[in-house]
UniProtKB/Swiss-Prot annotation:
Protein name: Metastasis-associated in colon cancer protein 1
One Pfam family, short name: SH3BP4_C
Alphabetically ordered keywords of this record: Activator, Cytoplasm, Nucleus, Phosphoprotein, SH3 domain, Transcription, Transcription regulation
Compartments (UniProt record): Cytoplasm; Nucleus
Lineage: Eukaryota, Metazoa, Chordata, Craniata, Vertebrata
Task of the protein: Acts as a transcription activator for MET and as a key regulator of HGF-MET signaling.
Main location: cytoplasm
Domain ZU5 intervals: 212-349
Domain of life: Eukaryota
Subunit structure: Interacts with FASLG.
Gene3D superfamilies hit by this protein: 2.60.220.30
InterPro entries: DEATH_SH3BP4, SH3_domain, SH3BP4_C, UPA_SH3BP4, ZU5_dom
Modification sites for Phosphoserine: S19
């Protein structure tokens, strides 16, 4: 079986060269495992000239860019090609069909104006001035217009052998539309041009793409065609076409459903799907399989009054008719397509036969999913826009073109955003929603007037796709880094519907400077690249092994000797004197009940003692101590022991420490890498302090991995940071690890915890699980920690920097569960001891009163 696959980004099929495909990394869509896939520039090429294509394909691939001298053939901005388009009309016959070897023919260089957009002469563009926009920065479109104007003087050159597809009838007389189509197909990224050259805000340096279309060429043995990043698949059975013939299948999904299908008795629950076929001489039907965004209610009345239907039309706007050959199981529908046509439009809708009180709309009979997609730029910048997209089905494309972006109060050309994350939730009925976004990182903020957006009930009833924009900006001149922000969806009464967190991509990488810039431009480059703020200088205090000075003590009123030892709990005899680290108390479960405990030290061991079992006395009242010496080193060694058993995300740890530690040498010395010198960073070209810190951390990780039976990465790193007095950073790392480990330990029990913490409804819980469901429609047991982590991360974000309350409330909620995991997993109790000991450790171990709060 042979399936020839291709991707294009406009239904008109604009020609694409191999070099153009290197501008943006594209992921191939998923196909059946049995498919044999080969790339093809145009299906007609294989259909009409299979031998020629095979013969010359290998030779062409030997050249890095075989079209280097002829790429102007697909460039609609050169006047000679524009003139060729107007003068040589060939009744929609592609030149490729007349001369399929045209792509592989070597030609002379001729004039440089026949070059690719990759070869734009930047200096020539810089010398060009626009009378309309002198002194102002130029957009990519304007730069390309300059090239177009320059080419006008050379319209007599290369007046033959130009490659231009004439099957774009609808674009012939609309140059702007053709330009947009060409940019879309070619995936021209603004970031491909030097940002300092075009002086544009880097926040808008995004690839220009249109909706993704998936097309495959399938032979008589059949196969499957799946729309990328979706649950939409067309299955082509064996024998669908005769032996020797091929079927071309093209899929395209539109987020906006037909508005006439959304009213009180009907609502769409899938995107509008366009299926294009190249061969109608068929012998077998096609099978469409897709997931839908709703299920009929389980009650008998809903089952009788409501049905899910697949609607078919030959036009995008209808009229639609119901297809009878449908099968629905839970949230998946299968449709047998018998009456085939060259272009078909299909959409799934829930329809009610009638409404009976108290039902007001079709929504009362179904459980409808509403999805939110978070879109943003490929890289973040000091100021960037996040687009929140809301729709009534579960399809969210990987890239989305937004045409109503405004900058400085003016509309700019369409911008393509990348999908950062998505979330689905269930709504009982269409109603107004309030969506707010807030940053979880103090280095970034959301513009005040854009923190909260409203979605109207009418928009949900009409099935509209709603786009809301949120502007993020870097606070002052702080260092750029990825960060997390939270999205909250609420009802008008303030009841939360969905809460989730999104992690941004990395900041934009530094673009390579042009090596051949003139001297005056190089000087300007140096000025522009000057740092925004001076290097942060922090003098870290030295950790001192000093004896702890306790001010509070407790005399035990009874003996406690446990048959089954419990980690982090003290055992004592009646009359023992225990040194207390303070008057603060922690609430944790003991043998069977939740009690209040002091953190104390007895016989050289730190642990918990029940408050009711001791009588607190002052230092002057102490008559006898079993051990009078307990140093800061003893304290540090014991309080960090639970970190050996905590789970962590290495990338998060690496990012946080690299950003918040400002002296790599101090960190290296504390970790035992005092032999490292500046010369060690030359081979990795680490210039920034954060890069050097990152190198030290990676070295620690490698060493701990080599001796993983005796060394623990997180444990050793936290010990080093505490010796540097980086307590705020330590608290952040501990909270991250505790939340993640709790999620892993909880597994499917997270639902019970969510109900106890914030009283989540069943629908809200399902909203956390939907993104992690597998092919069976359920979350696998081994993957259940993911929705648990999503929930706990969102919940903990509301505490801000108050790490003690987060850990205490988490411990209390876990203890209240029917079968508490904390009865046998005590590491969270150990973490509570740690955070309640930090203040005593700091006061005693560091002679300076200066706080290094990072």
């Amino acid at each position: 079986m042979l399936i020839t696959e291709r991707k294009y980004f406009w239904s008109g099929r604009i020609a694409q060269s191999r070099s153009e495909a290197n501008l943006v990394d594209m992921e191939a869509g998923k196909l059946s495992k049995s498919c044999n896939i080969t790339e093809c520039q145009d299906p007609d090429l294989l259909h009409n000239w299979p031998d020629a294509f095979t013969l010359h394909g290998n030779n062409a691939s030997k050249v890095t860019n075989p079209f280097w001298n002829q790429l102007s053939a697909s460039n609609p901005f050169l006047d000679d090609i524009t003139q060729l388009r107007n003068n040589r009309k060939r009744n929609n016959i592609s030149i490729l069909k007349e001369d399929p070897l045209l792509f592989f023919r070597e030609i002379e260089n001729g004039n440089s104006f026949d070059s690719s957009g990759d070869e734009l002469d930047v200096h020539q563009l810089l010398r060009q001035s626009s009378s309309r926009k002198s002194g102002r920065s130029k957009s990519v479109s304007e730069l390309l217009d300059i090239l177009d104007d320059t080419a006008h003087a050379h319209q007599s050159i290369h007046n033959s052998d130009q490659i231009l597809l004439h099957d774009l009838e609808w674009l012939k007389n609309d140059r702007e539309a053709y330009k947009m189509a060409w940019l879309s197909q070619r995936q021209l990224a603004r970031s491909c041009l030097d940002l300092n050259t075009i002086s544009q805000s880097p926040g808008w340096a995004q690839t220009q793409l249109a909706e993704v279309t998936k097309a495959c060429k399938v032979n008589h043995q059949g196969g499957s065609v799946q729309l990328p990043e979706s649950d939409i698949t067309v299955h082509v059975p064996q024998g669908h076409v005769a032996v020797g013939e091929f079927q071309e299948v093209s899929l395209r999904a539109f987020l906006d459903p037909p508005h006439m299908l959304n009213h009180d008795l009907s609502c769409t629950v899938s995107p509008l799907l366009e299926i294009m076929l190249g061969n109608l001489n068929t012998m077998e039907a096609l099978l469409l399989e897709m997931k839908i965004g709703a299920e009929v209610g389980k009650d008998p009345f809903s089952q009788v009054m409501t049905e899910m239907v697949c609607l078919h039309s030959l036009g995008k706007e209808g009229p639609f008719k119901i297809l009878s050959n449908c099968y629905i199981y839970k949230d998946t529908i299968q449709v047998k397509l018998i009456d085939l046509s060259q272009v078909m439009y299909l959409v799934v809708a829930a329809q009610a036969k009638a409404l009976q009180s108290p039902a007001a709309t079709i929504w009362d009979y179904i459980h409808k999913t509403t999805s939110i997609g978070i879109y943003g730029p490929k890289y973040i910048h000091p100021s960037f826009t996040v687009v929140l997209t809301v729709c009534g089905h579960n399809y969210m494309p990987g890239q989305l073109t937004i045409s109503d972006i405004k900058k400085c109060g003016k509309n700019i050309s369409p911008v393509v955003f990348q999908l950062w994350g998505k979330q689905s939730f269930l709504l009982d009925k269409p109603q107004d929603l309030s969506i707010s976004i807030f940053s979880c990182d103090p280095d970034f903020e959301v513009k005040t007037e854009g923190e909260r957006k409203e979605i109207k009930q009418k928009q949900l009833e009409a099935g509209e796709v709603v786009h809301q924009q949120f502007l993020f900006s870097l606070v002052e001149h702080r260092e750029m880094h990825l960060f997390d922000f939270c999205v909250q969806v609420e009802l008008p009464n303030g009841e939360p519907v969905a809460q989730f967190c999104i992690t941004t991509p990395d900041p934009t990488p530094n673009l390579k400077r042009l090596s051949n810039l003139p001297g005056y431009l190089q000087k300007k480059e140096e000025i522009k690249s000057a740092p925004l703020s001076p290097k942060i200088l922090v003098k870290y205090p030295t950790f001192q092994d000093k004896t702890l000075n306790f001010t509070n003590y407790g005399v035990t009123l009874k003996a406690v000797l446990r048959q089954s030892k419990i980690d982090y709990f003290l055992e004592y005899f009646k009359g023992d004197t225990i040194a207390l680290l303070g008057e603060g108390k922690v609430k944790v479960i003991g043998q069977s009940k939740v009690k209040e405990w002091y953190v104390g030290v007895l016989r050289g061991k730190i642990g918990l003692v029940h408050c009711k079992n001791v009588k607190v006395i002052s230092k002057e009242q102490v008559m006898f101590m079993s051990d009078s010496v307990f140093t800061t080193r003893n304290l540090l060694e014991q309080i960090v022991l639970p970190l050996k058993k905590l789970t962590y995300i290495y990338s998060v740890v690496l990012t946080l420490v690299s950003e918040k530690v400002y002296d790599w040498k101090v960190l290296a010395d504390v970790l035992g890498y005092s032999h490292l010198s500046v010369e060690d960073f030359d081979q990795i070209h680490a210039d920034k302090e954060s890069e050097k810190v990152s190198y030290v951390i990676k070295k620690l990780k490698e060493d701990c991995h080599t001796k993983r039976n005796t060394r623990k990465f997180l444990y050793e790193l936290i010990v080093a940071l505490l010796k540097m007095d980086c307590q705020a950073l330590v608290a952040r790392l501990i909270r991250e690890a505790a939340v993640l480990t709790s999620a892993v330990k909880l597994g499917k029990g997270w639902r019970e915890l969510a109900e106890k913490l914030v009283r989540l409804t069943k629908q809200q819980m399902e909203a956390y699980e939907i993104p992690h469901r597998g092919n069976t429609g359920d979350v696998a047991v081994e993957m259940m920690w993911k929705p648990a982590y999503d929930f706990l991360y969102t919940w903990s974000a509301h505490y801000g920097n108050n790490y003690r309350d987060v850990l205490q409330d988490l411990q209390s909620a876990l203890d209240r569960m029917k079968n508490p995991v904390t009865k046998h997993w005590r590491e969270l109790t150990g973490v509570l001891i740690l955070v309640n000991s930090l203040e005593v450790l700091r006061v005693t171990a560091f002679s300076t009163s200066e706080e290094v709060w990072k």
